[in-house]
Amino acid sequence: MSSSASRSQKERAFFQTEPWDTIDPNLVGIDSLKSRLQILLAEIIRREFPKIKAQIDKSLADAKHMLEALGSDRDSTEQQRKFLEEVAMKFQKIRDDAMETQYHKHHVLKTNKSLRLPTLVADRCDLLVKEIVRNGHAVQFDHDIDIDGELNDTGEDDYKDHNVTERTVVRNPGQDELDELMITPPILPVPEEKEVKKWIEEEYRASRGYDLEVMDPSILALLWQTQSQNWDFITRNFINDIIAYVHRFFCTLLTEVCPDTRTRDALLSRMMDDMLASYRRAIEHVNFILKVERFGTLITKNHYFADTLGKIRSKRRESDMKGLAFRGRQWHYSYAKETDTELLVRVSDLTKGRRYSSNLDQAVEDLHDLLLVYYKVARKRFVDAVIAQAVDYFLLTGEESPLNILTPPFISSMSAEQLEQIAGENMASKNKRHDLKKQIAALEEGKKVLKA
């Protein structure tokens, strides 16, 4: 007889003697205790089962997420190439949606506004226009003949949040690689409040020859180069800011699609020369546009030039004629009353008007009008060219844009050594992958046990 059976027999014999024989047999003995403990354990398991299952599910999801963050296995060259191609495709997908302002499609675009590149660029382009309008000219033009009323607009309300004379490049820590490109120009001088015609006369006297004192195109070119000198500062700061936005977008998005720091840093290092080259091309193109507009031939086929020049001269002649005008009855209107009057000018007075004290005065006035109108035409053309060419083509959408560097073909061009250097796993990463796989297998086995 086993010890367990012998013990049970002795317990029954004991509880059949007085006074223990009065106790319910189901409440005494080891066998009764064992049965009740089993019932209690079953109740506890039923009560705690949902919590245990939820904890296992959470631990399993966390482990799978960490394994997914490590990417696919990267032991072989093909596995490494596949891993980096997946990174490139994820990058392209989010980049394309960001450039189309489809911010709702990705959580990172909804939460990280530094990735809303088109919006940042649009805001900075608006600021460029305001800066050029407010501070682009070195000397204020004549207020009296500014047809559009925009060249001498102080625009204080537009500049509450921007110190235009001391703008600095908007960069984040970690963008030191851009330092050699982003040479901050000297402080921008604000437009001088001196009399523009006096300035033109001074320049004219310092540059004229001894022939007839008429409007000289060579003097106009000198005036133009001085009047547009502030464009350099404004435009260089502008392109620096756009490059900073693009670089921050690239690095932030790369961090999102490639969380592994070692792989990301190696991949970024591999692309950095190409990225810096694309930034240089944009800066060089801005310099080219500045050179053409400021030092090239003064030329335009825009009819706005002739139209506006005619308006300015008509406005000045109208001002001259007001001194010769008188009030007369409106006979030419059939409905006019005898008391209705208007300003009239005699035909014989049309030959009268502005009298210049010298040929120099007329030459200065002609130079001012031509400089004013050409400045407005060239300024609009210049801003459009910088945005369309240097920003849109060279930095955002062109074939050699920095945003088009990380592509599957770029990954395919890498050698086996480069792939190993960039995507090959170190021992710590391999051990972490092994531990996660082991943990996932154990948790999945636990789920099977719970289901059973």
Language-model region placement:
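Extended, charged coiled-coil "stalk/tether" helices of large eukaryotic trafficking and scaffold proteins
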Residues: 28, 50-452
